[in-house]
Amino acid sequence: MAGRQSGWSQAALLQFLLGMCLMVMPPIQARSLRFVTLLYRHGDRSPVKAYPKDPYQEEKWPQGFGQLTKEGMLQHWELGQALRQRYHGFLNASYHRQEVYVRSTDFDRTLMSAEANLAGLFPPTEVQHFNPNISWQPIPVHTVPITEDRLLKFPLGPCPRYEQLQNETRQTPEYQNMSIQNAQFLDMVANETGLMNLTLETIWNVYDTLFCEQTHGLLLPPWASPQTVQALSQLKDFSFLFLFGIHDQVQKARLQGGVLLAQILKNLTLMATTSQFPKLLVYSAHDTTLVALQMALNVYNGKQAPYASCHIFELYQEDNGNFSVEMYFRNDSKKAPWPLTLPGCPHRCPLQDFLRLTEPVIPKDWQKECQLASDTADTEVIVALAVCGSILFLLIVLLLTVLFRMQAQPPGYHHVADREDHA
């Protein structure tokens, strides 16, 4: 009986000690989402331009060329709804201005896409309704003039070094072979469209126009057969590779997509060291923006980013306090976002590894790296000459000042004290 009581007392003591340990031990922090960056393409739009023989000119489109359509508005509203569901519990259910910052390129279609997206992401709560009959609230979208945009409008320029890389790309076997293989096809398309000097780099305009017209139920001309449109689509994808790859992809990335990636990484690093807002940073831009970024990350799938597609960066704080980055690409509204893996890192990539692996494509000084080698040398010589000239000028001025003062002194001048000493 005494042994049983002793056993019970030992068990009670162990339970008591365990409870005390749990009370004094710091709680284990669960893995948590800390920050999200989104880059999405605008929604469905009208063609950017028509070709000379196009039966559908600008007056065919309600708002003219390059404008967001009702379909595009709906695509982004639905994306906003999907994001609202994905980040339920992370973002406030109602719009809170300190949680969200949105920047767009200065195009009607990207600005309107961002607004439609925000309408789906943050429908007004009862207290936010300014009119009971309108289920919408204004949310700010920021932008800069196109001529000043050095973040989202690609390709970035002017950049002589990038243009030099493009000229080198035109001399590669891949580009040359593609030109030879498609020479007759390009001539045929040029003849049917009335376009002059059609190249691998400009053919995408023809595909884009036909794609927009076909998407909106317009009858294509007889020459634009399914086989022709498919061939145009393949050349259009090649034009994206030409812009950001094929030749010296890392150097191109430093001058193009790496600029945007640098800003994204700067924001991720900042959010890992502070609890400041915002929680969500959104960029509304173009297919070229997405391709430039994904080529810099080396995760591009070789296909044009569809309307309202969205590249997602999620910053997590792990239960051990460290930070990790996960990437996703939503390019199909009927499927969950596709996980993207940075080469050399698992999908849940530690932030420090993410920064290290992307360092080769991050420019140190974009303006300087954009200069040609001869321009850089000339600039250094000019600066050196300017410095030497300035120093020489100052020495001459100083010398002239001394000489002037010496000549200004009267020749018979003596101190009074001297006169008294020799009286």
Curated annotation (Swiss-Prot):
Membrane topology listed for this record: Single-pass membrane protein
Provenance organism: Rattus norvegicus (Rat)
Glycosylation sites: N92, N133, N167, N177, N191, N197, N267, N322, N331
InterPro entries for this protein: Acid_Pase_AS, His_Pase_clade-2, His_PPase_superfam, Histidine_acid_phosphatase
Domain of life (superkingdom): Eukaryota
Name of the gene: Acp2
Cytoplasmic side: 402-423
One Gene Ontology term, aspect cellular component: lysosomal lumen
Keyword tags: Disulfide bond, Glycoprotein, Hydrolase, Lysosome, Membrane, Signal, Transmembrane, Transmembrane helix
Family statement drawn from the similarity comment of this UniProt entry: Belongs to the histidine acid phosphatase family.
Compartmental location: Lysosome membrane; Lysosome lumen
Protein name: Lysosomal acid phosphatase
Keyword Membrane recorded: yes
Record-linked Pfam families: His_Phos_2
Topology, Lumenal side: 31-380
Residues the record marks as active site: H42 (nucleophile), D287 (proton donor)
Gene Ontology MF annotations: acid phosphatase activity; phosphoprotein phosphatase activity; phosphotyrosine residue binding
UniProt-listed Enzyme Commission number(s): 3.1.3.2
UniProt entry tagged with the keyword Ribosomal protein: no
UniProt signal peptide: 1-30
Transmembrane segments: 381-401
Record field: catalytic activity: a phosphate monoester + H2O = an alcohol + phosphate
